[in-house]
Amino acid sequence: MRDYGKVSPQFWIGATGKELRSAGMEAQIVAMYLMTSPHANMLGLYYMPKLYIAHETGLGEKGASKGLARAIEAGFCAYDEASEMVWVFEMARYQIADQLKPDDKRCVGIQNEYNALPANPHLEPFFDKYEASFNLTRKRQESSKTASPIEAPSKPHRSQEQEQEQEQDKNTSSARADMPAGFVRFW
């Protein structure tokens, strides 16, 4: 959890702030919560189930969903239902800086934080937006693609196969030596 976060006065009077205000009270509350949430990070890209928003703002599920939808419509953030990841578009710029020099040690910290994020569809757009500003070096792609149920597991290397067969033969022969003559295993 962060110790502090920066909120610009532009939140209330900037173009996005005005959009949020016209979208309603829930949108403003959700937007402010997303910037100051104890679950947030400096990137503005983090895990945020809607239930957290509902509970911690007191808006309830309906109010939180409405506020989040309106904040998205206002261009404040994006939300992925499947991964429950939110991206507050300008948060990294406000929390970190507009631009960092390549030798700034924060660049490594930002890259590490980015690398540690779970797979989600905001990874590539985040990198594209902040690559130059924060000297990011490694772009991640959403890797939530799983193998098709039709696909068979990959075949082991020949040496692995031989080792497994030898191990099975050894276990089977030692188990047989312990059994009395004429004993038939039924399980």
Give residue spans per PLM region.
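Charged low-complexity intrinsically disordered patches
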Residues: D3, K62, A97-W187
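Long, low-complexity, charged/polar intrinsically disordered regions in eukaryotic proteins
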Residues: M1-I13
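A generic alpha-helix surface/boundary motif
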Residues: Q10-F11, Y47-M48, A181
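Short, flexible active-site loops
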Residues: G14-A15, Y52, M179-G182
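Winged helix-turn-helix DNA-binding recognition segment
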Residues: G17-M25, T36-Q95, L100
